[in-house]
A protein has these predicted regions:
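N-terminal membrane-proximal hinge/A-helix region immediately C-terminal to the signal-anchor transmembrane segment
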Residues: 5-15, 20-53, 57-154, 159-163, ...
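Cytochrome P450 heme-thiolate monooxygenase catalytic core
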Residues: 16-19, 25-39, 46-48, 63-71, ...
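Cytochrome P450 I-helix active-site segment
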Residues: 67-78, 181, 185, 234-238, ...
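Conserved cytochrome P450 K-helix E-x-x-R motif and the immediately C-terminal K′/meander segment
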Residues: 83-103, 272, 360-402
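Cytochrome P450 heme-thiolate "Cys pocket" and heme-binding signature region
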Residues: 149, 163, 318, 323, ...
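Short, small-residue alpha-helix embedded
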Residues: 327-340, 476
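Cytochrome P450 heme-binding "Cys pocket" and the immediately downstream C-terminal segment
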Residues: 343-345, 466-503
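Conserved cytochrome P450 K-helix/beta-meander segment immediately N-terminal to the heme-binding cysteine loop
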Residues: 414-444
């Protein structure tokens, strides 16, 4: 039985929803997200859907009824397997349709579970911030991730999670990240020097992924990724494909099955790759260890070998390597597509970069001045979040969510990909408009609840590496546009987003490159 196909994401948005927060109707735009100026460029893959009225709880509902009823949702059919099949084929498209039909809280009865999908920012914050101590991550989802991540901070719970996060936090603080900017810039410069100055059909996604891998390798292991980049990318794609196909079904076939040979090989390659880095470092004298993440983890091991076993060190290295480059590579890939399909916005950003940097490599002092670049990255992450759906949470005790009193063991699914394309919070939600973040900076934007833009999550489990990811994306993007003009190749079609742990194009993105006259190349 071969694994299921990767999930296609429709991102069909709904507008004009009336919620418990009042009537927030705004018309949806029918304009394309990424319609490029050149006639040869393809239209955006995300089409809007006509709004449908939500069915929120009625105000006259009695307190007793509200405390016991589930939110509205689709009919489960036979044990809910039909719902599960629809979600596995088109997750966000299906969730968007259900939100249009049932509102911002959707009850799914998939035997033996009760699951509530939450797409309202205030309700999401109520859960992930206000009631975080009542939530644990979904056991099945964690078991899928644990195949590769072991017992790292990504999958741990309770006191083990708190201890690991506290130990790792200093390495990802804003101050620590700022000190790493020269290494980020050096990695970007080395990669860009190998890129052609002119190409009609450049493998942009592959190049950005290799660059992001190289950066995290330098920060973690003080060495370049080198010839391992291509093998690592292939192994990660295979493991991600397998993990995503296993994510939706409660039972999975053992890895020993013949059709899982590629998954076994990919897992073995990645584990061997990380183990090799650890063994090489342990072979060096402690006094010669560089100041990087691996050295920090090994010092924790030397200080408390029971709490920080060598396997725990390997687990954290695996998570840092995978999470540390996947979000950046995914986000930069979609940003490059948005830039290629919006030449005027691209030129404005490039002009700002030239004005601020004058051909120099960016430093920590330069980054705050690159505001238009920052807005373009924020808008690309709004349209194409690397994690459009968060790992489901289970409540360990009854929780109050809006008007509903939900019992212990209820599962909650959070969908940032829907909230970030909601016309109530983002007018013309399918249109690439970096200026909306400029207006937010100037307090001119319509009041949008906190959490309506959350590409890194929110609450105590917010992404540990968000400062590193944001800084790396800014440095790399600035250096790309210093040198190159991006456009869509002749006859190319728009990329189709698929979710395989992170959001990626179904086929690797390729762009046309042109050198910018007078650009820095050294």
């Amino acid at each position: 039985m071969p694994p299921a196909d990767p999930v296609t994401l429709s991102f069909k948005t709904t507008g004009g929803v009336t919620s418990e927060h009042g009537n927030m109707n705004r018309p949806n735009s029918t304009q394309d997200t990424c319609t490029p100026a050149p006639s040869n460029a393809a239209s955006c893959p995300f089409a809007t859907q006509a709004p449908q009225p939500a069915q929120a709880p009625q105000p006259e509902q009695s307190e007793q009824t509200a405390s016991t009823a589930w939110p509205p949702g689709p009919a489960p059919g036979l044990m809910g397997w039909g719902l599960l099949r629809r979600m596995s084929r088109d997750l966000l498209g299906t969730l968007a349709q259900w939100r249009g039909e049932h509102g911002d809280a959707i009850h799914l009865r998939i035997w033996p579970e009760h699951q509530v999908v939450v797409t309202d920012p205030e309700l999401v914050r109520e859960l992930l911030v206000g009631q975080h101590d009542a939530l644990v991550r979904w056991e099945h989802g964690i078991s899928v991730f644990a195949q590769l991540h072991g017992h790292s901070v990504l999958v741990s719970e309770g006191q083990p999670w708190r201890s690991k996060r506290q130990a790792l936090l200093p390495a990802f603080s804003p101050k620590a990240v700022q000190a790493q900017i020269p290494a980020l810039a050096a990695a970007a410069q080395a990669a860009l020097q190998a890129w052609p100055q002119q190409s009609e059909d450049f493998p942009m996604e592959q190049a950005l992924t290799a660059l992001a891998m190289d950066v995290i390798m330098r920060l973690m292991f003080s060495g370049a990724i080198g010839e391992d980049a291509r093998s690592a990318e292939q192994a990660i794609r295979e493991v991600s494909h397998a993990a995503h196909s296993e994510f939706y079904w409660p039972l999975r076939w053992p890895d020993a099955m013949p059709w899982k040979r590629r998954k076994r090989r990919a897992l073995a390659w990645l584990r061997s790759f990380i183990d090799r880095q650890v063994r090489l470092r342990l072979a060096q004298a402690d006094a010669h260890w560089p100041e990087d993440l691996l050295s920090r983890l090994l010092r924790l091991h030397r200080g408390d070998a029971q709490a920080w076993t060598l396997q725990a060190v390997r687990d954290e290295c695996m998570t840092a390597f995978l999470a540390g480059h996947e979000t950046v590579a995914s986000s930069l890939t979609w940003w490059s597509w948005c830039m290629a399909t919006h030449p005027e916005a691209q030129q404005q950003v490039a002009d700002e970069i030239q004005e601020q940097l004058q051909g120099r490599t960016p430093t920590a002092q330069d980054l705050p001045a690159l505001r238009q670049l920052g807005w373009s990255l924020q808008e690309a992450m709004r349209l194409y979040p690397a994690a459009p759906v968060l790992i489901s949470r289970r409540c360990t005790r009854p929780v109050q969510l809006g008007p509903w009193r939900l019992p212990a063991r209820t599962l909650f699914m959070i969908a940032p990909g829907l909230m970030q394309r909601d016309a109530r919070w983002f007018p013309q939600p399918d249109v690439f408009q970096p200026q909306r973040f400029a207006d937010a900076d100037k307090d001119r934007a319509p009041a949008a609840p906190r959490g309506s833009w959350m590409p890194f999550g929110t609450g105590p489990r917010v992404c540990l590496g968000q400062h590193l990811a944001s800084t790396e994306m800014t440095v790399v993007a600035a250096m790309v546009l210093q040198r190159l003009r991006l456009s869509v190749p002749e006859g190319a079609s728009a990329p189709r987003p698929v979710l395989q742990v992170t959001l990626r194009p179904s086929t690797p993105l390729r762009l046309r490159l042109q050198s910018r006259r007078g650009a820095q190349t050294g």
